[in-house]
Amino acid sequence: REALELGLKLADEVKPNLLVATDPDADRMGSAIPHGGDYVLLSGNEMGVLLMDWLANMAKENGEDVASKVAVSTIVSSAMPDALARDWGFEMRRVLTGFKYIGDQIDQLKNAGEEDRFLMGFEESYGYLVGTHARDKDAIVATMLCVEMASYYAQKGMDLYEAMDALYKKYGYYLNGTVNASFPGESGAQKMAGIMSGLRENPPAEIGGFKVVGMTDYAACAEMPRVSGLQKEAAQELPAANVIEFRLEDDNK
């Protein structure tokens, strides 16, 4: 919210229907919606899901085959896009953190002559890419589409907060959180290595009251997670990374 303070101050004066802002190099986009007497800030995951669903709707209205589309996100982003992919029928791919990996997926589609299959890519850290003109986050295009999407829902009598709530009611409510832990210096690196080693050797049986039903260790070049869609290409392996994913019951992770 702090990053939007100047915009929110101006919004109090001009009373807009939507506040959109980018960072100085215009690769990340944040938004705020006036609702219930205050401004509601959408998370990066929520905006990614909203754009993904809206783009699928636009593709359908334009007579495109939505099931042929490919969307890309990261292994640390919300699991909610998987539910959208299953419902719409498009393919959802998960890559390591970093937009270069999303760009790699675009290159693969381009090399196969199938650029038009790319629906969008996003990270939970407010980075979005719609179109194949770039291989990095593009807040300029994302801002234009966000405004167009807001207009689309306004014609239906909804703001973006209400549109997101409608998706939650349809697909289920997803809560995403990040905890940052610092391990400075050589001793910190050793401690972190010990924690990761312990998790690999003795994985927890439950986390937060949810049973652990699966574990993926990305240090071993794990297979790229894919959901739904055509899945025309052979399975891909992700580059090795010191990341462990625990899958919990009820589609939590």
Predicted regions mapped to residue ranges:
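N-terminal small/polar loop signature for handling phosphorylated ligands or for N-terminal nucleophile
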Residues: 1-31
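Catalytic or ion-translocation cores adjacent to nucleophile or general acid/base/metal-coordination motifs
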Residues: 3, 43-56
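Short, hydrophobic/amphipathic alpha-helical packing segments
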Residues: 4-8, 49, 147
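Phosphate-binding and adjacent anionic-ligand microenvironments
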Residues: 12, 16-18, 22, 38, ...
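Short Gly/Thr/Asp-enriched flexible loops that form oxyanion-binding sites at enzyme active sites
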Residues: 27-44, 81
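Short gly/pro/ser/thr-enriched loop/turn and capping motifs at secondary-structure boundaries
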Residues: 28, 47-50, 99-103
